[in-house]
Amino acid sequence: GNYAADGITTATLKKKDGFIVVKFEREGYVTLETKIFTTDKRKAVSYTMRRDAFFDVSVASGLVNKYFSVKISKDLYTVDESGKRNTELAWKMIHQVILNYFDEIQTTDMASGFIQTPWLYKSFPEADKQIRTRVSVKESNLGGDLTFQIKISSEVAPLIASQRDESFQEIDRIVKDLEPMISEFQARLGKL
């Protein structure tokens, strides 16, 4: 059966040929799993967990992996007499912000109102993890105002998983280098 314990714990094995699997988990540390056989004569065992480098270079964020809205400042677009909107300046600004953090933009389509970066990969060999991040932007018109819906996707996978999509899972953390991007979107484009 499963037994969860916290701190110092004692366990007794009844089978002579059995073993137990001990798994140590704590947020911010690399998970450690080991087997202890009944033939092991030690009276006590102790393990030291290593810090997870991934947690040291990332921060939790409630805005990753979901769209957030930025209402665009009226200084960044114009509307002519016929009601046609010129959003070129707003689009230039959002490209500038993205290119401060990403080397390239994979897709940009002003006509359909969509921008997406390629995945940006970062590896953490000592934690056996890799994280990938990308930005997607959709233009929308909430209440008649120009608004961008922005999503920063952040996913993690084991390092050995290569770059296969099915290996990655969403995580509520973002690499610290990219965290200022959220504030920059808000400050340079308009208001939340």
Description of each model-found segment:
Residues 1-2:
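Short, ordered, surface-exposed loop/turn motifs in non-cytosolic proteins
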Residues 6-12, 16-192:
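Ser/Thr-rich, low-complexity intrinsically disordered terminal regions
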